[in-house]
Amino acid sequence: MKQITGGVTAAKGFQAASTAAGIKYKDRKDMAMIYSEVPCKAAGTFTTNIVKAAPVKWDHNVVYNSKAAQAVVVNAGIANACTGEEGMGYCRQTAEKVEKVLGIAVDEVLVASTGVIGMQLPIDRICNGIDAMVPLLKGDTGSGTEASKAIMTTDTKNKEVAVTIEIGGKTVTIGGMCKGSGMIHPNMCTMLSFVTTDAAISKELLQEALSADVQDTYNMISVDGDTSTNDTCLLLANGLAENPEITEKNADYEEFCKALNFVNETLAKKMAGDGEGATALFEVKIIGAESKEQAKVLSKSVITSSLTKVAIYGHDANWGRILCAMGYSGAAFDPEKVDLFFESAAGKMQIIKNGVAVDYSEEEATRILSEPAVTAIADIKMGNASATAWGCDLTYDYVKINADYRS
């Protein structure tokens, strides 16, 4: 596997465009489009929040009931959530506009929205945005990058990644982009993720690969514990790499899954590290667990602990908060057997041994915790399973950003 420059346009046959449609923001792009030269197999995972935005309902129907998908239209600024039948109508009108200008069937158009809940979409601006983007569709790296910028809301940086692998003597590319900074606690931030590949793979295995991988990537991140109404991850495969089609769980499938995991994990970590107001990526590894599920529950409990997140912001080795968060997670373990370590680019040090603090240097701990990426490793000595979760520190700016979000 080789990491390359680019995102959603890295794979053969995929193009992207973006524009400033004036949906909510001024003087910045707020719409993006992804287009495949040929119809794609489509897979998707969506929010588990009972309150589902109109685009989530629309895309779920396209992914599970349509034979193919060929375009994705994304807007930032307004979520099109809690908008009733009118909101669903806007999804259809968006798809009908794409059908008119690109000749794609309505049920092969995916839509996604992110932004303020409860506001109706300015559909005329959406349609005008589509008109503006179609002539701009290109397969170059820059177009993909600009699209990744256009879907941002409170994000401070765009997020994209791409890799190539060899399958059956053919080069297969997987690329993706995402947005997410606040309301990030997927269970499938506001999290939108779009992954494209030129791999030839059956729709069934494409969906299975995505559903399984989401559990270990996007579902293992949290910024603020809020599961969005709009969380969506879409994976499109157009087959233009011309590799032997992957129709069974063989070595080719495993290679594809490894590359997909790299793309999704990279995007997930980019979202966690770009949490609203965040200054540090906070990674929690639980090792020595009895089961992977036990390790997942423990690690996610720690990254969602507000007191722990504040301690990371303060570069404070307040290990009691970590042990406390593990204790109320609901997962059984013996606290008197836990070893805890902090690690970063500045070094690694043990903080507790068998549930009791060791003699460590607070100054050294502060130095380790002052890096932009910090890891806490807890060994619970019950087995050989492990899991990793990603979050961020909690700062004053998080409150400021969200207090002013609608203004």
Feature-to-residue mapping (PLM):
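A structural signal for small-residue-enriched, beta-sheet-centric alpha/beta enzyme cores
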Residues: 1-75, 79-90, 99-407
